[in-house]
Curated annotation (Swiss-Prot):
Residues 1-31 are annotated as: Disordered. This is Conserved oligomeric Golgi complex subunit 1. One of its GO terms (biological process) is intra-Golgi vesicle-mediated transport. Keywords: Golgi apparatus, Membrane, Protein transport, Transport. Component of the conserved oligomeric Golgi complex which is composed of eight different subunits and is required for normal Golgi morphology and localization. Interacts with COG3 and COG8. The gene is COG1. Belongs to the COG1 family. It comes from the Eukaryota.
Length: 1068
């Protein structure tokens, strides 16, 4: 036997081994012989415990099996009783069925006996049975969604009830039977009728629910409508209203189910509800409009019923019920008149507009269209909605009806339904979506321009900006700061026409130009300008995407002024912030001398220049602000660029294989066709716009220009004050003004005199160069101009700067002369001549700021690289020049009149030559008012001049526009020996700088370089001349002079004449 306990299992091997040796006696004997008593007792106790465990296990096993056996017996007895009961029931059913089959079945039972009492009792019983069977019948109809059948059964039960009530009300009949006593045999009749009457509300409710169940066929909705019309006694107008209200509920359910978080989901909901509207209008036509001679489906359904004799089966002699039913049908037919087409159209139009208001109105407190956040998404949504409107598949349920009406297949079902039902040339898009989409586009424009205002924070940028480190910085350190700008401005963007397929890729020259702009503006200004441009570009892209529609024309008229006004308002707000910061800096400059904790002037100037660069960037190098404010016709370029990108991606797709013919429905061809169609719609609308710039653009340009000048005015005032202080200090420390001997840099001039038929020569010494501090004064001013942008600065800024400097010079010399008259030492004759030359030279160089200039405002174009200025100047003497003349007159009075008459023409000639030699060095000022253009330039004979002589070669006065073409292909190119000539040039320059004089030694050595340079200039300008008109020659000449002026920053004063010969006219 098995042992379940652990102890028994432990000694199992011992027991087995004992039993295997033989009988129990031998085992016991061997055990006593081999084992001690302690182990024998252990084995005994283990064996006894094992025996008890086995007994208990056997006892539990037998008890469980017995209980199972008893339960099984009880189950068997119960099963037997159930089987007997089932058998008895089956036998009873079988007998009943046999008894039913043996009885005669008739619609109206025929009684063998004509006993009136029995006939009346039988008739009443059959009618009561009809009422009793009615609930079950109606339930079955409702379960099968046969609502019209259920309504008919209810109405017939009502007629039977009316018949019974009539019997109950009469006291006797033909057979003198008390009918009331007979009805007393059916006490549940009243209760039964209450049950039947409750089905009226159920039929109506289930029918309404059926109408709210989408996705069913038209027959199901017709059945529900007719059931409601019968039960609730509605006329056709009310039925139409009920049908339209149920569809409105459909639309509300779809709208409320949309979360409004995803634009794609919103567009799909719009398409779904639009499909509901189209299908509903089509079904209204099929249900209520009579087309040709065929009756509408609703009337056909509600008025077509089987004969009344077949509706009251089981009731003997139902003549009165039939009469009641016929009267009911007559009344129904009198009510169910076919609606007039105009009434149906008005109801549908009213319903359609209400649905449209719900679609674009607020749903759960927000507009679903707000989920669409870009103009491109609006355009895509419109495309999908229009595709849904024109889809034939949406109205597939009405195609058979349309075919029966028109006699053939209909290609545009919605257009035909619109003609039949609405009776108006109604466009669903215009009626529902157009206004909402336009308003949403305006909201998108508003939000993006609001983001522009938030993204470009002028105040924070100005407060954080400073290129100067340290608490205090003096003016000399400011002048010695490293230069970061200037030379890049000789590069102009290359504006080439881009092909349609090539896209809008920028050329390397354009990229270089943009990098130069970024280097000049700095990262802060570039980021702010790019932020403005990016957002304006985004707005314009959205707008153009929205214009790719059939409604492009009306949208352009509405949105073009709107976006221009918004752009103007946003940029004006930005400029207002700039103006506010400039006012703050102006106030800070005034407080600088009074407050020890004031902002250092150098930092104030840097911040004002920072705003000046920002305004310059927005005025001249913003691409999309002038594009938006310009004529909408210019927006075509953006449209074509966007389409070219799409076409490029289309062309990069794999083509069809050669053995596969491209069909008209191929995706690639279809996409290409759609793009062309959309582009043509947008471009046609844009080209139809007026070709005029918004007046706000000119106003905005004037504002930016004025603010740019205002920003540089702080720089002009501060720099003029500091430079004039240096000039005054140098002027006061100039001891040469009291010298009686010729000063350094003077030239001897030979004056021929005729006396008594003989000529004598008189040598006079006159200054040929301005004073070093005057040249330094003008050089530092030019260098500062070069630092902040060079010749790209607005002309009016340079004029103001020149005028301010000339005013300061005038004041300095007036005060200086007044002080010298009252103190020692007095100014000598030589000093007077030097001052006269200095004043005349400074007045000529700065004369551009002392003129009245009428500047024609340039017309803004989309290409800022081709920005040209045309000026018609009318120059008149103003106050500064008059004051200079007064100082000059005061100085000449210190000279002997006869001597002054001798000196004057030669002194002014020296000044003219000095002006011409320094024209390149001071080109920023000279370009404002170029003087002495008819004066021949001469080389200086001053022994201290460090100008290297160069071989004189013939050169052209003007660009060779009409000169014979000199092809570079037929001309041998002259190679320039760079190494030898460069070395000789350096040696020559070194000799001059060391004081060695060499007038002619290098002329022959460098003659080859002159010839090569002449050939290069002729060859390189021929192509330029071939593409320039005569009117452009002067512009090019002025620009080249302005560009060459930059080289003056790296040349000494005396070397200015080296390059001036390339930009000034020589007299032959």
């Amino acid at each position: 036997m098995r042992m379940s306990s652990a102890s028994a299992g432990e000694y199992r091997p011992s027991a087995v081994s004992l039993s295997s040796n033989g009988g129990g006696q031998r085992d016991a004997e061997s055990l006593f012989r081999t084992k001690p008593m302690s182990e024998i007792r252990i084995v005994e106790s283990a064996t006894r415990k094992n025996i008890e465990d086995k007994k208990e296990e056997l006892r539990q096993l037998v008890g469980t099996r017995y209980r199972d056996l008893i339960d099984s017996a009880d189950s068997i007895v119960h099963m037997k009783s159930l089987c007997e009961s089932i058998s008895a029931n089956i036998s009873s059913i079988h007998g009943n069925i046999r008894s039913l089959s043996s009885s005669s079945v008739a619609e109206t039972p025929k009684l063998a006996s004509l006993n009136p009492v029995r006939v009346n009792v039988y008739g009443i019983a059959c009618r009561v049975k009809y009422l009793v069977d009615t609930p079950e019948n109606i339930w079955g109809c409702l379960d099968e969604s046969m609502f019209l059948e259920a309504a008919g059964r209810y109405m017939r039960a009502q007629h039977v009830q009316q018949r019974l009530i009539k019997l109950e009300g009469c006291g006797g009949g033909v057979a003198e039977v008390d009918q009331s006593k007979l009805l007393a045999n059916f006490p549940l009749l009243e209760h039964q009728w209450q049950i039947v009457e409750s089905f009226k509300a159920q039929i109506s409710q289930r029918s309404h629910e059926r109408l709210l169940d989408p996705g069913l066929g038209l027959g199901a909705y017709v059945d529900a409508l007719t059931a409601v019309a019968v039960v609730d006694e509605l006329d056709p107008e009310q039925v139409l209203e009920l049908f339209l209200d149920s569809r409105k509920t459909w639309i509300l359910q779809k709208l409320n189910a949309c979360t409004g978080e995803d634009a794609g989901e919103v567009v799909l909901v719009f398409c779904d509800v639009l499909s509901v509207i189209q299908v509903t209008v089509g079904q209204v036509g099929e249900l209520f409009l009579q087309a040709l001679t065929d009756m509408p489906l609703f009337y056909k359904t509600i008025l077509s019923t089987p004969p009344a004799s077949q509706l009251f089966g089981g009731i003997p002699n139902p003549e009165e019920e039939v009469e009641l039913w016929k009267s009911f049908r007559d009344k129904l037919e009198s009510v169910m008149l076919i609606l007039d087409k105009n009434d149906v159209s008005k109801s549908c139009l009213t319903w359609l507009r209400e649905c449209g208001g719900q679609i674009v109105g607020k749903v759960s407190g927000k507009h679903l269209i707000e989920a669409i956040v870009t103009g491109a998404e609006l355009g895509s949504a419109e495309k999908l909605i229009r595709e849904t409107m024109d889809s034939k598949d949406v109205l597939r349920g009405s195609l058979d009806w349309l075919k029966s009406v028109f006699g053939s297949e209909v290609e545009l079902p919605w257009n035909r339904i619109r003609e039949l039902v609405l009776g108006d040339d109604l466009n669903l898009w215009d009626e529902i979506f157009e206004k909402a989409f336009v308003e949403r586009m305006k909201s998108i424009i508003d939000s993006k321009f609001e983001n522009l205002t938030k993204a470009v924070n002028v105040a924070d940028s100005v407060h954080a900006y400073s290129e100067i480190t340290g608490e205090k910085i003096n003016f000399q350190a400011y002048l010695n700061r490293p230069s970061t700008g200037g030379g890049v401005w000789f590069i102009e963007p290359n504006s080439k026409k881009v092909g349609l397929i090539s896209g809008n890729k920028s050329s390397p020259e354009e990229s270089d130009f943009q990098s130069c702009l970024t280097a000049y503006f700095g990262p802060e200004v570039s980021q702010m300008r790019d932020a403005v441009d990016r957002r304006c570009h985004s707005v314009l892209e959205d707008l153009l995407s929205f214009f790719e529609s059939e409604k492009a024309g009306p949208r352009l008229k509405d949105l073009a002024p709107y976006v221009q006004n918004k752009c103007y308002d946003s940029v004006s707000a930005l400029l207002a912030d700039v103006d506010k910061e400039l006012e703050f800096l102006c106030a800070a400059v005034k407080k600088e001398n009074k407050d020890s904790e004031a902002i250092p002037p150098a930092i104030i100037i840097e911040k004002s220049l920072f705003m000046g660069r920002l305004l310059f960037a927005l005025l001249n190098h913003s691409k999309h602000v002038p594009l938006i404010l310009g004529s909408p016709r210019l927006w075509c370029r953006e449209t074509m660029t966007a389409v070219s990108d799409k076409l490029s991606s289309l062309l990069r797709q794999p083509r069809f294989s050669s053995n596969t013919p491209a069909t008209a429905d191929s995706p690639g061809k279809q996409l290409h066709t759609d793009l062309r169609k959309q582009t043509s719609l947008a471009v046609a609308a844009l080209l139809g716009a007026e070709e005029k710039t918004s007046p706000k653009f000119e106003e905005l340009n004037r504002t930016m220009r004025d603010l740019c000048i205002k920003a540089h005015t702080l720089w002009i005032k501060w720099l003029s004050d500091e430079l004039s202080a240096i000039l005054l200090r140098d002027l006061r420390s100039d001891d040469g003004l009291s010298a009686t001997t010729p000063l350094r840099g003077w030239e001897e001039t030979i004056v021929k005199q005729e006396q008594d038929e003989s000529q004598s020569e008189l040598k006079i010494s006159l200054p040929s160069l301005p004073s070093l501090y005057m040249i330094s004064f003008l050089c530092r001013a030019s260098e500062e101009i070069h630092r902040i942008g060079g010749h790209v600065l607005d002309r009016s800024i340079l004029q103001k700067f020149a005028s301010s400097l000339l005013e300061k010079i005038t004041i300095i010399y007036e005060d200086f002369l007044s002080a010298r008259e009252a103190s020692e030492p007095q100014i000598s004759e030589k000093g007077v001549l030097q001052i006269l030359l200095d004043l005349r030279f400074a007045a000529d160089v700065l004369s551009g700021g002392d003129t009245s200039t009428n500047v024609e405002t340039p017309k803004s174009t989309i290409n800022r690289s081709a920005y040209r200025r045309r000026q018609d100047q009318q120059k008149t003497k103003l106050v500064n020049r008059g004051r200079i003349d007064g100082v000059t007159s005061q100085l000449t009075q210190k000279l002997d009149p006869i001597d002054w008459l001798t000196y004057e023409p030669y002194l002014w000639e020296n000044e003219k030559q000095s002006y011409l030699r320094h024209a390149v060095l001071f080109g920023f000022f000279v370009q404002l008012n170029r003087m002495y253009t008819d004066t021949a330039q001469k080389l200086s004979i001053n022994i201290e001049s460090n100008i290297m002589p160069c071989s004189t070669v013939p050169r052209f006065k003007y660009l060779p526009i009409s000169a014979p073409a000199l092809s570079s292909r037929s001309t041998n190119k002259v190679s320039i020996p760079v190494t030898s000539n460069d070395a000789s040039a350096r040696n020559s320059w070194k000799a001059f700088t060391n004081g060695e004089q060499s007038q002619t030694s290098d002329l022959e050595e460098n003659s080859n370089f002159g010839v090569a340079f002449k050939s290069f200039m002729q060859e390189s300008t021929l192509k330029l001349g071939s593409i320039l008109t005569d009117g452009q020659v002067g512009i090019f000449k002025d620009r080249s002079a302005a560009a060459m002026s930059t080289f003056g920053d790296i040349l000494p004063a005396q070397a200015a004449g080296l390059l001036s010969s390339f930009t000034n006219t020589r007299s032959e």
